[in-house]
């Protein structure tokens, strides 16, 4: 007998880096008629509320109808504006009551390949960016963006016992959006074993591409932590790619040294080194913010959720890669 979902939501994220910084005070003034609700602060009754320093602005971006192979879904769209130059756009879909698990997996597969989501998120981001442009400092949009999907189950057959529930349903098929192939037991067992809980009635499975949350009270604090982590992943990727380009420029300049006039080479070399130093300072500030975030997330459960996200997003690997590149740049620039 198929598992039936009675209540739940799907959050589809697209995260964009549009600038070096965004003045949230100025942006709030520009969007005062549209900004909905308080800054992000993870308020809950049973879990401790936490507040992110320089918490983002939340902006309502209207509604649309999303056409997927599994049906047409009304979509609520909202965005968060982060002071470190990032805009995260979220499409929220309600899971229709009575949805079978297999149909949810089919919906997941449709979401993964939907071009409509991409176009919708980009268009909403562009409109929002235009409206807050006076608040944007050092505008420079990166062509790469992050995507992620969070599935939130509030009520389903057997979900009152989350540990047993995830053994009954094919979690791996949902997380990996695989509606055609039958996945190996290893995939399913690994995901089940990685689950974290605050109480016996809730549960979170956080993977690199999507997450499953069982939240009987409809709480969104873990979902917010995942989105928060996703914005940091984008920043890690940006700095890693940017430093890689700077290294390539330096290596190219070194290769051309014999064919170039010495003072021209020195000027180019100095410019690259100076720019790299500025980026080093930017990244150092960013890294401090990430480390402070880990301390800020003071609730034990949310701290575990944040660390689980950091693990899945390979924060340590990105940090090491960036550190190696910065060390190489420093050595070459001396």
Annotate the PLM regions.
Residues 3-5, 69, 74-76, 193-195, ...:
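Short, well-ordered helical secondary-structure segments
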Residues 159, 172-175, 212, 324, ...:
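A generic structural micro-environment signature
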Residues 238-334:
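Membrane-associated alpha-helical segments
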Residues 165-268:
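Extended, charged amphipathic alpha-helical segments
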Residues 12-16, 89-91, 151, 203-205, ...:
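Generic structural hydrophobic/aromatic packing signal, biased to beta-strands
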Residues 28, 105-109, 229-231, 261, ...:
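Generic alpha-helical propensity signal that fires on short helical segments
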Residues 58, 62, 67-69, 209-212, ...:
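N-proximal short alpha-helices
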Residues 1-202:
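Short Lys/Arg-enriched alpha/beta "domain-start" segment
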């Amino acid at each position: 007998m198929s598992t039936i979902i009675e209540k739940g939501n799907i959050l589809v994220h697209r995260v964009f880096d549009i600038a070096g910084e965004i003045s949230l005070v100025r942006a709030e003034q520009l969007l005062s008629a549209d900004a909905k609700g308080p800054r992000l602060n993870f308020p809950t009754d049973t879990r401790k509320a936490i507040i992110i320093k320089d918490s983002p602005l939340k902006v309502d971006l209207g509604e649309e109808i999303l056409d997927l192979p599994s049906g047409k879904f009304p979509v609520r769209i909202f965005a968060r504006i982060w002071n470190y130059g990032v805009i995260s756009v979220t499409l929220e879909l309600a899971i229709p009551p009575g949805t079978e698990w297999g149909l949810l997996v089919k919906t997941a597969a449709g979401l993964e390949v939907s071009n409509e989501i991409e176009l919708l998120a980009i268009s909403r981001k562009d409109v929002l960016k235009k409206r807050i442009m006076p608040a944007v400092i050092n505008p420079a949009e990166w062509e790469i963006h992050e995507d992620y999907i969070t599935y939130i189950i509030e009520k389903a057959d057997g979900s009152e016992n989350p540990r047993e529930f995830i053994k009954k349903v094919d979690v791996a098929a949902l997380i990996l959006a695989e509606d055609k192939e039958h996945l190996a037991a290893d995939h399913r067992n690994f995901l089940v074993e990685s689950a974290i809980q605050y109480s016996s009635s809730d549960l979170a499975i956080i993977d690199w591409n999507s997450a499953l949350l069982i939240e009987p009270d409809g709480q969104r604090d873990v979902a917010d932590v995942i989105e928060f982590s996703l914005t940091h992943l984008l920043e890690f990727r940006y700095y890693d790619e940017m430093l890689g380009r700077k290294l390539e420029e330096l290596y190219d300049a070194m290769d051309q040294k014999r064919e170039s006039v010495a003072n021209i080479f020195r000027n180019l070399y100095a410019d690259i080194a100076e720019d790299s130093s500025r980026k080093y300072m930017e990244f150092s500030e960013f890294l401090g913010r990430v480390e402070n975030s880990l301390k800020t997330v003071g609730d034990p459960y949310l701290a575990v959720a944040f660390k689980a996200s950091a693990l899945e997003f390979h924060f340590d690997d990105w940090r090491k890669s960036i550190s190696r590149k910065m060390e190489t740049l420093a050595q070459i620039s001396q």
